[in-house]
């Protein structure tokens, strides 16, 4: 295949989306199910691996081996409080591998464990394939988005996931920044505008304030809640109905995973309905112990169940305004991103907060991020279209970065919301006489003391010549590149001795070897998936050939054209094959093909004889036998082929 353009991928917590900039505009690409967003789900079964819709659709039958929310694990340590609290809610198992979380599943009858990067890489591979199927070209270059909140290690791990998926990640950009680009292209204005981006997705909530002037974006502030989104609203509804079921039927379904999962799917559907209708009905047959569950919910009740969560979305809005040092009257535009911003109550709360100001909903909220990422991908890969030419992107660091100085004080070198790439240098000295070395501990966070902030990594600079305290000069440099990856170095001015760290190590970064290995494994899994597809198609081919052949010889139009002995011979062989198939559903492709050849050996001579004696097609059937497809041509192409539906 020829090389395709660069794409933009919104790798979401619950759903992902891919877009491409071509012919002067962005196209959001639908997957094979016709959906423009794809669930960030990967499932493992006894026979195959499923990604996307196919994985999400079977989650009720296979909850412990269906992995989602990898984005909540990526770039985190196992003992991270977030990981520990999230684990309680996941049906799949998360295990501790040398301090790093891995998800453990059963695949083809064996226990397998995967790093979050590997799971995310599977979703990215799916998005890459969706783009390739649409473009008819191979896709390697991509811009991938992350929440503004992501720290360094989460960004790096996301980039690694891209590498494992066989992508060249041109840049990692913030989701709100991407949405701003999508927006900036649509509305070119001369004067400076302050834009607030309100992004409420399936699992995360981000508020960002940007200024846009003459095609230049600057991010002024970011705030949000990494744990608020559509799923939380679903949960409130689920709990409401569990309680209702308890009241009416005196049964507690909460311990039954499958029942809860079916209820949740129905609730998600009802929630979507409530964005356009004032009430929705829920009908689930035999939800629990044979009891049907038929009920309904009004929009008002849904809003009441989520009242605190909905209202709570305004707190980060206020915080972002404070950080940007802006009053709400100074915001020119409010942009809605994320499917949950379709909820009328949320739109109303936001509109009232901004004193009745109109909200921008012109961009499909599910697609805005991928849209902007696609534009950015075009810019970075040198698209010369005037639509993207004069767009420049300035991203920021989400948290302040600094080092610990005497007494556990956080000394900030790079303030939060500093535009990146950036480089800051500051000179430090020793704290005691003849001190031989210094420990440089790098932290991120806004608190005055390092113990309240997050340790990113540390290293020692040793070999400082003996000197009284305060004499040695140690120059510390913080350097953040365009992807938000941080390098910290320290140099002793007297000796020129240097040591440095790329902040990633202590967060459980994957090593080069790990990534190489995972790339190979990803290839292997992909090959296995292909093999599985081939196997299924040769099985289907054999099955349809046997059934069609049976139907053909039993057709009354052939009565008298075929002698009973031949007919019986074919029927016996077909029945033998059909019963073999029932017992050998999981046989290898070669076995299915062998069985088909055996069957053809019996059938072909008889069918050929039939033609010759009939002098052409029997019963005026120029197109072949009824139900028999075209005359068998041997191999996997015999019998009508049915397109697989994943």
Curated annotation (Swiss-Prot):
UniProt modified residues of type N-acetylserine: 2
SUPFAM superfamilies documented for this protein: Actin-like ATPase domain, Heat shock protein 70kD (HSP70), C-terminal subdomain, Heat shock protein 70kD (HSP70), peptide-binding domain
A cellular-component GO term for this protein: Prp19 complex
Keywords: Acetylation, ATP-binding, Autophagy, Cell membrane, Chaperone, Cytoplasm, Hydrolase, Isopeptide bond, Lysosome, Membrane, Methylation, mRNA processing, mRNA splicing, Nucleotide-binding, Nucleus, Phosphoprotein, Repressor, Spliceosome, Stress response, Transcription, Transcription regulation, Ubl conjugation
PROSITE patterns: HSP70_1 (PS00297), HSP70_2 (PS00329), HSP70_3 (PS01036)
Residues in cross-link Glycyl lysine isopeptide (Lys-Gly) (interchain with G-Cter in SUMO2): 512
Sites bearing Phosphoserine, chain numbering: 153, 329, 362, 541
Record region (Substrate-binding domain (SBD)): 394-509
GO terms classed as biological process: clathrin coat disassembly; mRNA processing; negative regulation of DNA-templated transcription; protein targeting to lysosome involved in chaperone-mediated autophagy; RNA splicing
EC number: 3.6.4.10
Protein's cellular compartments: Cytoplasm; Melanosome; Nucleus, Nucleolus; Cell membrane
Record comment regarding domains: The N-terminal nucleotide binding domain (NBD) (also known as the ATPase domain) is responsible for binding and hydrolyzing ATP. The C-terminal substrate-binding domain (SBD) (also known as peptide-binding domain) binds to the client/substrate proteins. The two domains are allosterically coupled so that, when ATP is bound to the NBD, the SBD binds relatively weakly to clients. When ADP is bound in the NBD, a conformational change enhances the affinity of the SBD for client proteins.
Subunit structure: Component of the chaperone-assisted selective autophagy (CASA) complex consisting of BAG3, HSPA8/HSC70, HSPB8 and STUB1/CHIP. Identified in a IGF2BP1-dependent mRNP granule complex containing untranslated mRNAs. Interacts with PACRG. Interacts with HSPH1/HSP105. Interacts with IRAK1BP1 and BAG1. Interacts with DNAJC7. Interacts with DNAJB12 (via J domain). Interacts with DNAJB14 (via J domain). Interacts (via C-terminus) with the E3 ligase STUB1 forming a 210 kDa complex of one STUB1 and two HSPA8 molecules.
UniProt protein name: Heat shock cognate 71 kDa protein
Source organism: Cricetulus griseus (Chinese hamster)
Gene assigned in the entry: HSPA8
């Amino acid at each position: 295949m020829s090389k395709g353009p660069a794409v933009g991928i919104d790798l979401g917590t619950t759903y992902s989306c891919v877009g491409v900039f071509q012919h002067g505009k962005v196209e959001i690409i639908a997957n094979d199910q016709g959906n423009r967003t794809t669930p960030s789900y990967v499932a493992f079964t006894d026979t195959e691996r499923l990604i996307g819709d196919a994985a999400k659709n079977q989650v009720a039958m296979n909850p412990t081996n269906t992995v989602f929310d990898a984005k909540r694990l990526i770039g985190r340590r196992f003992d991270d409080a977030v990981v520990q609290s999230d684990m309680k809610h996941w049906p799949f198992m998360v295990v501790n591998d040398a301090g790093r979380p891995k998800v453990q599943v059963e695949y083809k009858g064996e226990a397998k464990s995967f790093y979050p990067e590997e799971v995310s890489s599977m979703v990215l591979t799916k998005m890459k394939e969706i783009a390739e199927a649409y473009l008819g070209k191979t896709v390697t270059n991509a811009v991938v988005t992350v929440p503004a909140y992501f720290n360094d290690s989460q960004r790096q791990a996301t980039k690694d996931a891209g590498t494992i998926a066989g992508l060249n990640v041109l840049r990692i950009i913030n989701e709100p920044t991407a949405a701003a680009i999508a927006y900036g292209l649509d509305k070119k204005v001369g004067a400076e505008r302050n834009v607030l981006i309100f992004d409420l997705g399936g699992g995360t909530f981000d508020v960002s304030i940007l200024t846009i002037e003459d095609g230049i974006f600057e991010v002024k502030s970011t705030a949000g809640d990494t744990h608020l989104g559509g799923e939380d609203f679903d949960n409130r509804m689920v709990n409401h109905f569990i309680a209702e079921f308890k009241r009416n039927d005196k049964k507690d379904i909460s311990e039954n995973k499958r029942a809860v999962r079916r209820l949740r799917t129905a609730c998600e559907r009802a929630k979507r309905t409530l964005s356009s209708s004032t009430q929705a009905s829920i009908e689930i047959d035999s939800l629990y112990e044979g009891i049907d569950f038929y009920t309904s919910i009004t929009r008002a009740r849904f809003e009441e169940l989520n009242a605190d969560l909905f209202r709570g979305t305004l707190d980060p809005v206020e915080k972002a305004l404070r950080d940007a040092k802006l009053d709400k009257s100074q915001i020119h535009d409010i942009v809605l991103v994320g499917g949950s911003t379709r909820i009328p109550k949320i739109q109303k709360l936001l509109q009232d907060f901004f004193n009745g100001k109109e909200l921008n909903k012109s961009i499909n909220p599910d697609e805005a991020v991928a849209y902007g990422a696609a534009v950015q991908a075009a810019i970075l890969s040198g698209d010369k279209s005037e639509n993207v030419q004069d767009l420049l992107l300035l991203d920021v660091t989400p948290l302040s970065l600094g080092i610990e100085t005497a007494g556990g004080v956080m000394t900030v070198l790079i303030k939060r919301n500093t535009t990146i790439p950036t480089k800051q240098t500051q000179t430090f000295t020793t704290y005691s006489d003849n001190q031989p070395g210094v420990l440089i501990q790098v932290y991120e966070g806004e608190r005055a003391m390092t113990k309240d902030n997050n340790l990113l990594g540390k290293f020692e600079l040793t070999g400082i010549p003996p000197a009284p305290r305060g004499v040695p000069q140690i120059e510390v440099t913080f350097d953040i590149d365009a992807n938000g990856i941080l390098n910290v170095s320290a140099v002793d001015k007297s000796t020129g001795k240097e040591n440095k760290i790329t902040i990633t190590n202590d967060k459980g970064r994957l090593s080069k070897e790990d990534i190489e290995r995972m790339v190979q494994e990803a290839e292997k899994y992909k090959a296995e998936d292909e093999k599985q597809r081939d196997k299924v198609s040769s099985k289907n081919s054999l099955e349809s050939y046997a059934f069609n052949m049976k139907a053909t010889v039993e057709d009354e139009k052939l009565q008298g054209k075929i002698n009973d002995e031949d007919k019986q011979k074919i029927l016996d062989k077909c029945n033998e094959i059909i019963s073999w198939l029932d017992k050998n559903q999981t046989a290898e492709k070669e076995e299915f093909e062998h069985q088909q050849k055996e069957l053809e050996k019996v059938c072909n001579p008889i069918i050929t004889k039939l033609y010759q004696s009939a002098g052409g097609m029997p019963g005026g059937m120029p197109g072949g036998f009824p139900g028999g497809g075209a005359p068998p041509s041997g191999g996997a192409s015999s019998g009508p082929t049915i397109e697989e539906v994943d």
